[in-house]
C-alpha cells in the first residue's frame, strides 16, 4: 500500500560493487514509525547485526526523509543520517538541515542506504533514476569547503552536496558530515562511518517533486499556521540573531558552562553575545521548508562561518575560558572544514586544557588559548601530534591519560553546552538518551 507523503522507494547503493537497486519502502515500518528518525532506527534494527564493527563493511549509512519532506510544511526539510556509532557503539541518528533531504525526496526516494566499502575513494552522484560512481582520489585529503566548492563548480548548484573532511577520512570518532557548505550531521562519528566506506561526497539532484492531495488547501493551511504560530514577535529573534539568543537565557538560568562545566555563568557574556556577533554579519539564508531562516553568515578577519550556533559559541567561548568573537568564528570555520563535530571536538580540547592546568598530563594548551584550539582541531582531524591522542574523544583519551572525573561524556558522546546541574530535564536526557549525552532528546 502506498501512503500519500511517501515516494514508496528505497535506493540501495553497494559501494564495493558499484551497483544501485530500488526496492519498495517497508510501509509497515512507515505506518508505525512515523518520521525520518523512526524509519531510520527501524531499518537499522532490521538490518544491522549486534556486535558489528561500526567502521567495518557490515555497518550501513542511512539517509532518511519523512512524509512531509519536500512540502512547504515548516521545519519539514531536515534529513536524518543514521548508522551504528563508532563513538558509542549504539544506534546513532543525526539531523541535518539545508536542502539534501528535499532533493532526495524530489529524486523519488524516501531513503538511501549505503552498504559495504568502496575499493578506492569515490563520490556518488544521484540524479533521479541515475546513479554514478566517480573516482575521488583528487579530493581525498581536502577540506569539506574546498571539496564542495570544486564539486559545485563542476556539476552546478542544483545539487546538494554532502561531504567529509580529513577527520572523516581518518575515521575520528567525532567526525561529521557537511552538507550545502555549512550544515552538519554532527554527532556520534557519523562522518567516520562515511569515511570508512571511502566515500568522500554524495551529490543529490531531484526533479520529480512530491504529490499533495489538495495543494491549494494545504498551502492555505500552511500559510495560516505560519502567520498565526511562527511569524510572531516572540519568534522573530531567531531570524535576527539565530540561536545566539540562547546565550542570555542560558546564562541567566545558570546553565551556560564555564571552563569545562566548573561554573554555570559568565558575568562578561555580553562580550560575545548575539548583539556583538551580528555586527559582523555578511548575509543570511534559511534551510528548505523553513519559515524563519536563522542562518547568519559572519566574517571577522579571515574567519567566516554560517552561525555560529549557541553550542559552538559556548564550546569555543566560555566553556574554554574564551571571550573573543574572532576565536569563536575561526573555531567554527576550521572545525567545519576539517569535518569535526564542534561539540565533541571542543569538549575534548577543553578537557585537555584542564588536564594541563591540573598537571595530570601536558597537552600544550590551557584555558583561554584560542589559537591552541585551532591548532588542535587541525591535528585531531589529521591524527597528527597531540591531536592523535584526542581524535577519538574524551572517553578514550581520559581512559588513557586519566582525568575521567572531569571527562564530560555519556556512553562516549561528549556533553552539549547545557549545564545539567541547572536543568533536571536536561540532566535526565543526558543520562538516558539512546545516543549518549544529547540535548535534542530533551527540551532544547
Model regions and ranges:
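Extended C-terminal regions of large enzymes
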Residues: 152-155, 159-162, 166-188, 194-444
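Protein-protein interaction/assembly regions in multi-subunit complexes
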Residues: 1-236, 240-269
Amino acid at each position: 500500500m502506498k501512503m500519500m507523503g511517501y515516494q514508496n522507494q528505497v535506493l540501495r547503493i553497494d559501494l564495493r560493487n558499484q551497483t544501485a537497486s530500488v526496492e519498495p519502502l517497508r510501509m509497515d515500518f512507515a505506518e508505525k514509525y512515523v518520521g525520518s528518525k523512526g524509519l531510520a532506527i527501524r531499518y537499522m534494527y532490521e538490518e544491522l547485526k549486534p556486535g558489528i564493527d561500526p567502521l567495518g563493511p557490515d555497518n550501513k549509512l542511512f539517509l532518511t526523509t519523512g512524509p512531509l519532506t519536500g512540502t512547504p510544511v515548516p521545519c519539514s526539510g531536515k534529513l536524518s543520517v543514521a548508522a551504528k556509532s563508532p563513538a558509542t557503539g549504539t544506534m546513532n541518528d543525526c539531523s541535518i538541515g539545508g536542502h539534501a533531504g528535499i532533493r532526495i525526496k524530489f529524486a523519488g526516494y524516501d531513503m538511501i542506504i549505503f552498504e559495504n566499502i568502496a575499493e578506492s575513494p569515490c563520490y556518488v552522484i544521484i540524479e533521479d533514476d541515475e546513479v554514478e560512481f566517480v573516482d575521488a582520489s583528487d579530493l581525498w585529503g581536502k577540506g569539506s569547503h574546498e571539496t564542495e566548492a570544486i564539486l559545485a563548480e563542476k556539476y552546478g548548484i542544483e545539487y546538494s552536496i554532502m561531504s567529509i573532511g580529513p577527520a572523516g577520512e581518518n575515521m575520528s570518532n567525532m567526525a561529521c558530515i557537511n552538507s550545502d557548505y555549512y550544515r552538519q550531521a554532527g554527532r556520534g562519528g557519523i562522518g567516520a562511518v562515511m569515511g570508512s566506506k571511502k566515500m568522500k561526497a554524495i551529490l543529490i539532484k531531484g526533479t520529480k517533486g512530491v504529490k499533495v492531495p489538495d495543494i491549494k488547501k494545504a498551502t492555505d493551511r500552511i500559510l495560516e499556521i505560519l502567520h498565526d504560530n511562527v511569524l510572531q514577535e516572540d519568534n522573530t529573534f531567531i531570524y535576527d540573531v539565530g540561536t545566539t539568543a540562547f546565550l542570555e537565557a542560558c546564562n541567566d538560568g545558570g546553565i551556560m558552562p564555564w571552563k569545562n562545566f566548573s561554573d554555570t555563568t559568565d558575568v562578561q557574556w555580553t562580550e560575545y553575545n548575539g548583539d556583538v556577533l551580528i555586527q559582523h554579519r555578511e548575509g543570511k539564508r534559511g534551510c528548505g521548508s523553513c519559515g524563519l531562516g536563522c542562518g547568519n553568515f559572519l566574517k571577522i578577519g579571515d574567519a567566516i562561518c554560517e552561525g555560529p550556533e549557541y553550542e559552538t559559541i559556548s564550546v569555543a567561548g566560555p566553556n574554554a575560558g574564551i571571550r573573543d568573537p574572532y576565536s569563536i568564528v575561526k573555531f567554527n570555520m576550521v572545525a567545519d572544514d576539517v569535518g569535526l563535530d564542534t561539540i565533541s571536538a571542543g569538549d575534548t580540547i577543553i578537557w585537555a586544557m584542564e588536564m594541563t592546568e591540573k598537571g595530570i598530563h601536558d597537552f600544550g594548551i590551557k584555558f583561554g588559548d584560542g589559537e591552541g584550539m585551532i591548532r588542535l582541531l587541525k591535528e585531531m582531524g589529521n591524527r597528527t601530534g597531540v591531536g592523535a591522542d584526542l581524535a577519538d574523544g574524551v572517553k578514550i583519551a581520559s581512559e588513557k591519560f586519566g582525568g575521567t572525573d572531569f571527562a564530560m561524556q555519556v556512553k562516549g558522546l561528549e556533553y552539549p553546552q547545557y549545564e545539567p546541574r541547572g536543568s533536571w530535564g536536561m540532566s535526565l536526557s543526558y543520562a538516558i538518551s539512546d545516543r549518549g549525552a544529547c540535548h535534542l532528546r530533551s527540551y532544547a
